[in-house]
Amino acid sequence: MENMKVLLGLICLMVPLLSLEIDVCTEYPNQIVLFLSVNEIDIRKCPLTPNKMHGDTIIWYKNDSKTPISADRDSRIHQQNEHLWFVPAKVEDSGYYYCIVRNSTYCLKTKVTVTVLENDPGLCYSTQATFPQRLHIAGDGSLVCPYVSYFKDENNELPEVQWYKNCKPLLLDNVSFFGVKDKLLVRNVAEEHRGDYICRMSYTFRGKQYPVTRVIQFITIDENKRDRPVILSPRNETIEADPGSMIQLICNVTGQFSDLVYWKWNGSEIEWNDPFLAEDYQFVEHPSTKRKYTLITTLNISEVKSQFYRYPFICVVKNTNIFESAHVQLIYPVPDFKNYLIGGFIILTATIVCCVCIYKVFKVDIVLWYRDSCSGFLPSKASDGKTYDAYILYPKTLGEGSFSDLDTFVFKLLPEVLEGQFGYKLFIYGRDDYVGEDTIEVTNENVKKSRRLIIILVRDMGGFSWLGQSSEEQIAIYNALIQEGIKIVLLELEKIQDYEKMPDSIQFIKQKHGVICWSGDFQERPQSAKTRFWKNLRYQMPAQRRSPLSKHRLLTLDPVRDTKEKLPAATHLPLG
């Protein structure tokens, strides 16, 4: 049992590793370089933004290793959530790292080059690891200590920040310099304010303190007349948001570097310790001019609360002379009935198509089942004046012993099933006519009394000369097609390849209604009505409401009806 647990554990560990090798990730061609200071703790975020609503996960790898960086916090280099931790950074940590974002449908990765730097000789920092920031002369602005928001404690507070200039402590006199959290406010910027500013703090991790240092290259730029900032987004708009969802609102401004861009809600600025709202700042210098920047302040809403629908979120940009604003109003999502309608229409269409296909394939079985199951519940039909359900028209034998299979089918098998098992009433010439009756009168009278005309076809009947040339056939087909409008059913006892030799009327009937082919034998034994031939024939017959005469009635080839003498089944009156 213990060995089985070990084996299952190994399988669970191997499956994710194998899947990592199999997956092919799309790589973003970003040229991202991170400079870290040796022997300092550092935390860096993946440049790719995961979508937690889609189940995105982030995994870090070093170099080309297929093994993810450990999530064990005792490891000097480890991953916590989507962040990569160096506790502390060493020179040998330099190299490139892959950040991979994946879910069940896609995989993205980006390459991050990490360089761990030692301090330059005679300095308390490395000049390669500086972050340039610019302020206008004679204006007010602020220097922001970059990439330190990850060091907030459980109360969402940063450690105390100490400021230095050119490695010497900076005097915060509250006249020219003000220290506010991770920002250094500079009043009335002057040329002599140029230099390298260091923001330093101590961060405690697992009971041990580590230094955190950032170097800002403060560059002064000439005084210039301020241009009015332009808010590109939002534009006084509304956004649908689901309650409890996580969304981002972006304030995109084109203006000066010193323009302040921030969000307000319900008349107040966003508090730094708000449990649901957090701001993130970005700026990008315009390539066309060094005096204009794209300033982006992102408001991250971790959970949309009901009160957020009451008041708009206001994007504010201001400088010493100008104040601009635009708002975003959150609204509840409007139900999208379009998708439901499309889905319902597709389902309905698919259902109809399936039903039509099923009906076409099983049409005969469905109709017969309906007749057998529901005929007793339907109201009785008014009499149509017909006596017979079908008149059987077949080639007459030329002498005794000829066409014995045909006679067996006509006088034995056909009545046995249709009359004996299903109660149909057939008129068969040679069985139901009386001695001495005129053929023309018998045919004319009984075709009119029949609901169907069943024509039986066989091969080798002298080019089918019997069809349409004798008086009986002519009268029967004429009455069925022209005078009475009776439905005609063609039965092939043998496969007939060439219908061109047949009369046009037969060709027309075959083309319009098709033909039913016999597939059984001619043994004189009880027939099963469940074969395809008998089902197709019953389908062409009228709906039967009478009970069958006998489900196992066997007919002889010389039937006697009532007390009158009938003609022998194998001998018939000559036609015409």
Curated annotation (Swiss-Prot):
Disulfide bonds join C25-C107, C46-C99, C145-C199, C251-C315. GO terms for cellular component: cell surface; external side of plasma membrane; extracellular region. It is found in: Membrane; Cell membrane; Secreted. It catalyses: NAD(+) + H2O = ADP-D-ribose + nicotinamide + H(+). PROSITE patterns: IG_LIKE (PS50835), TIR (PS50104). One of its GO terms (molecular function) is interleukin-1, type I, activating receptor activity. Residues 20-338 are extracellular. Residues 360-576 are cytoplasmic. It is a single-pass type I membrane protein. InterPro entries: Ig-like_dom, Ig-like_dom_sf, Ig-like_fold, Ig_I-set, Ig_sub, IL-1_rcpt_fam, IL-1_rcpt_I-typ, IL-1_rcpt_I/II-typ. This is Interleukin-1 receptor type 1. It comes from Mus musculus (Mouse).
